[in-house]
Structure formats: structure tokens, C-alpha cells
Amino acid sequence: MTTDSHYGAIGYNPFEGLELTGRVKKVFLRGQCPQDLDTAKNIGSHDPVEQTHKVMQNIRQLLEEVGGKMEHLCKVVVYLTDVRHREAVYRTMGEYIKGVHPVSTGVVVTALARPSWLVEVDGTAVIPDDAE
């Protein structure tokens, strides 16, 4: 089976991949939630867009702290408590990863660790040794 035939059969490419060359740093981010990284205090909003902004800001901050950028994200897993939030969450995520197309998996779950959380995103980044 070729990538092309699989793409045509299901409407997307399940074989998106990444080839690592040279020295790189691979970063695994735990699930980021709509809370302050320093205090673990929730943002106090039940809006999926506002929660997603905070989640993506956390991801950006953590990547920058280890010398990376959002463009280094190669994989994300998005956990939602309500499938109806999917479009708004993905649109908001797109504001942070314009031009970046990480492999993505979306999962709808019954609940997250705190009842007020609507979205959680974990990610994997590959940062080249010569990243600026």
C-alpha cells in the first residue's frame, strides 16, 4: 500500500513523518492545561477559546525556556471534554502554530484532572542544536 493510495482512501495522510538529522534536542511536554505555570492557578474562564490561548501560551513559554520555538513542535495530542469545542480549539491553536503542521491526535474524554478544564494539550518538539 502506498502513501498516495492510503491518502485517497481516507482523505488525509496518516504517514506524515519526521526525519531527524544532526544533533537535536527532543522535548516532551506534559499535558498543558489552562493554568498559570508558576502558581498552578486556573485562569478562571470556562470558555474553550480562552483556555486554549492559555494552554498554547504555556507551551510556547516552556519551549522558549529550553531554546525552542513553536515551529519546533512536531506532535501534539489534544484532549477535549466536549467535541463541540473542537473547531474553536483547533482554530485558536492555529494562531500559535501558523505554518507549522505537527502530527496531531484529538481525543474526546469524559473529564480532565480538574472539572473546569475543557482542553489539555501535550506536545513533542525537536529542537535543532543550532536553533536561534
Give, region by region, the residue ranges found by the protein language model.
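N-terminal presequence-like segments and the immediate start of the first folded domain
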Residues: M1-C74, L80-E132
